[in-house]
Amino acid sequence: VIFQRTVLSGLVAELPPEVWTSDEVERRLAPLYGRLKLPEGRLELMTGIRERRFWPQAIRPSAASALAGRRAMQAAGVGPADVDLLIHSSVCRDRLEPSTAAYVHGLLGLGPQAQILDVSNACLGFLNAVALAAGMVESGQIRRALVCSGEDGRPLVERTIRLLNEDLALTRETIKPYFANLTIGAGGAAAVVSRDDLAGPGAIRLLGGAAETDSSANGLCEGDTSFAELDMRTDSEALLAAGVALAQRCWGRFKGVTGWDESTPHRVVTHQVGRRHSSLLFEKLGLDPAKDYQSFDRLGNVGSVSVPATLALGIAEGRIKPGERVALLGIGSGLASMMLAVECQ
């Protein structure tokens, strides 16, 4: 798809205040590490994740989403009556019914004119929501949308630590499906999607994008809730191989739609999984690793928040500059990939 007149404004990353280093996670896993004689430092060594962030107390996804949404509206100069569509796009949600967007709407005090819905597609949700909102902007159905996401990985990480320490039947082999859980973090992200003539200076222009799906891999990473607790198991090796193969196919489609090639983007922002994933992805796509802007070393994997938060941080830190073109390479379990071409202004 090609976008003619749609931009992102007020893009923000909402970072929780509590920092958990990978060393701290391993200290909490001392019973497991001692029993299986696991070497200390392996978590950071294998992933490149030095730390991740959590909120210090339980927080509903709607509250995290609204924290980011409020800041995005302020940054974009948008009031409650200006939002025609609100999308909550994270993996985490308050409950099955009603939509988490209903709670975000109330927390932000949006007007009755705003449509609400949740878009859920694992770690790809935010990019999916942006593309859907952009399509509605381009067609004239809406003028502005607010896309929000709020992820809280703390319950998953804490449950995983407890399970790994308490289940004495686990071995070095059988702990592998739980390893990816220890890379998860928390955070929020939000942006206003609108027509370009309604946005102020500094907006990010959406140029186009492409998507690709491989549902044969839908069993490689599965998460669920059980009695208010989160559970996730991942075949990390198979997921890495299938994910990179899917990304290669999507990259080919993306280049055909946008007219870009490997030399076009000044910067590349991918879903933030870890060092090995990024290295293999850049190798297989033929991209220059020097163009990679990462946040996983300090944020871990923050689900749907990872790509928008990383883009927001790159801009805020001056690592992504006005006039530069950026390839946003998203992927989520399922497997699904979406890649968007944007230009910072």
Would you name each region that the model predicts?
Residues 122-124, 150-154, 160-161, 188-189, ...:
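Short acidic/polar capping segments at secondary-structure boundaries
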Residues 141-161, 214-218, 275:
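Acyl-CoA/ACP chain-elongation machinery
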Residues 36-44, 95-110, 156-170, 219-225, ...:
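Acidic-glycine-rich active-site phosphate/pyrophosphate-binding loop
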Residues 20, 97-100, 131, 156-161, ...:
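Short acidic, glycine/serine/threonine-rich loops at helix termini
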Residues 81-89, 261-271:
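Short glycine-rich phosphate-binding loop at a beta-alpha junction
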Residues 9-12, 89, 120, 145-151, ...:
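Short beta-strand segments
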Residues 1-58, 168-241, 249, 331, ...:
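Condensing-enzyme catalytic core mediating Claisen C-C bond formation in acyl metabolism
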